[in-house]
């Protein structure tokens, strides 16, 4: 996938395309035996809320097709106030990426990394240098990508539902 990539704020007209990407990610996780995103999450309502709050972003191919999605949150994450086993690198303000997903046809082509870099740049524009993210313990593809790109394992956090997640962090340079 060598096309140029435009990353822009998601709009309500993107919801159908975003949900198609979400469904393809749910299927991929299911095929890997990972129970992440298997209970109707993220729902259309969650994506609408991201868009309404101004935190949803889409990656678009040259032809305008939406091929990736993420929520870039600069206001913290309630689940990150308690971390088990280890600790966050800093107690500074931080950016969190949620709901990172890429269309199955173009997976493993660097789109997720471009979305992550966009989140870093967005954070830096707001004076934030700490980047945090979490994923399901069984999501080894995501965990490898994070580790490959400088993220360190910081411990375990628990979502509002009580589900555990592996937490990662990195200082944005």
Residue ranges and their predicted role:
Residues 6-20:
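A short beta-loop-alpha structural element at the N-terminal edge
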Residues 74, 134-135, 147-166:
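Conserved catalytic-core motifs of GNAT/GCN5-like acyltransferases
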Residues 102, 108-121, 144, 148:
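Conserved acetyl-CoA-binding loop-helix of GNAT-fold acetyltransferases
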Residues 19, 26-46:
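Conserved GNAT-fold acetyl-CoA-binding loop/helix
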Residues 71-101, 107:
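Conserved acyl-donor/pantetheine-binding loop and adjacent beta-alpha core of acyl/acetyltransferases
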Residues 116, 123-135:
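Conserved GNAT acetyl-CoA-binding A-motif
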Residues 113, 125, 137-155:
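Conserved active-site alpha-helix within GNAT-family acetyltransferase domains
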Residues 107, 133-143, 161:
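Conserved beta-strand-loop-alpha-helix junction that forms the acyl-donor binding cleft
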């Amino acid at each position: 996938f060598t096309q140029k990539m435009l990353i822009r704020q998601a709009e309500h007209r993107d919801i159908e395309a975003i949900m198609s990407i979400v469904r393809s990610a749910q299927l991929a996780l299911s095929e890997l035996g990972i129970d992440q995103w298997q209970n109707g999450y993220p729902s259309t309502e969650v994506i609408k809320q991201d868009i309404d709050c101004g935190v949803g972003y889409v990656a678009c191919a040259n032809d305008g097709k939406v091929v990736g999605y993420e929520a870039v949150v600069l206001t913290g994450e309630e689940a990150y106030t308690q971390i088990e086993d280890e600790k966050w690198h800093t107690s500074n303000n931080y950016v969190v990426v949620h709901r990172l997903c890429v269309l199955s046809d173009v997976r493993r082509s660097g789109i997720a990394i471009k979305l992550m870099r966009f989140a870093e740049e967005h954070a830096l524009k707001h004076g934030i240098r700490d980047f945090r993210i979490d994923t399901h313990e069984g999501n080894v593809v995501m965990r490898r990508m994070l580790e490959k790109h400088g993220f360190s394992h910081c411990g375990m956090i628990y979502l509002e539902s009580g589900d555990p997640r592996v937490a990662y962090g990195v200082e944005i340079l």
